[in-house]
């Protein structure tokens, strides 16, 4: 039983200033497609801003959703974890009407390494966070879709220190760089 409209009414009547809807059921979890028709329905029914979330994987999804729904805003979730450049792409497509060129392999690695440096500069309470082993799944997500990314997964699985990551990046760039 889908209760989004009812919950939207209750939330608004309780004084909420905005409402975010993830367009999937609990049983769906992260599987399947978000129900943007349902999100649009709730947005039409409510006077508070409704922020839609689900299946926003690339910049063109934002344009489509803006055209198809009365949502006041959108929320990006897992797509940003694997492709943080989505925000750059969205800004570009909103300003210019077309998606930008994807970041080069070098640009992606620069971002990944800078992100890793910033994460590792933070104080950690747990000893298990002192090396990069716990970030290996994040590296795989961040390199997904890059040319040759499947071939470097094994190397990413051995990364312990930032220097290891830099070696993987350098070798990957050398092999697949657009400038070579």
Placement of each model-derived feature along the sequence:
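Short beta-strands and strand-loop turn motifs
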Residues: 20-24
